[in-house]
Amino acid sequence: MDERTLRMFETKFEYTKEKLATLEEAIDEKTKQGVVIKAMYDAKLGDLIYERTKLFYLCQYLNKRVSIVKQYRERGEYISSTMLDAILESMREENINKLAEYKEKVEASKRYLESDDVGFYEKGIIYDQYKEIIYKIHPDLHYYTSPTNMNIFKRAQMAFIANDYVALADLNRLACENNENLTFKEKQLLLKKMEKLIQQKNIKLEWIPIRAPFDKQELVKNEAMLNEEKKRLMNDIEQFEMIKKQLEEIIGQIVLKTDA
């Protein structure tokens, strides 16, 4: 491959990768927002979380593949597609195993919610299953809501610093449901401080339940909101798939030129 052609591929790849990063960030935020609204009573969003995870690992795999090609090229060495596949086989298998684990959690959540023996408020437990899936995608998020010696407000502050919608919703739920045995005055103070932090961070208030847990009337209203959000997210995923194909084509061309 001549230097001019390689530079052309690299420029196209970097541009596409930037578009991909921007879109991934949008999908990530919409996924978190959807979980905040829906996770306390429904598991339908699990499929979208799973798809987002799958795309995340695919992007990671493609980036690694391009990185290896560039390393060999910089050393003036040749690497074939077969060699690349062999080098990345363990990474591919690990990703497949992780995805299978996530998929089972999503399906388990659905089975749980479809059971007639499970009451409306009992289904709030599903939120914890969602957290487990999300924390495996973003392990650092687990710190904010793990049992620690820090009080709930300190954990809320840390969640706000990270713009962590999922942890925020959980901490708010802890306060509203009084899971930490807060007095009424302590609970009022916490929610007031959390609302102030939201305003400081310019986080959209409509996505954050600074109040008691959803009642049935709110759930009906938020069902329509989430359905609209899911449509937008599916459009983003379609765009993500298009960009993924572009990346695959670029990588394929780089590999073919390298083989030649």
Model-derived regions, located:
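C-terminal accessory/regulatory regions appended to core domains
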Residues: 1-260
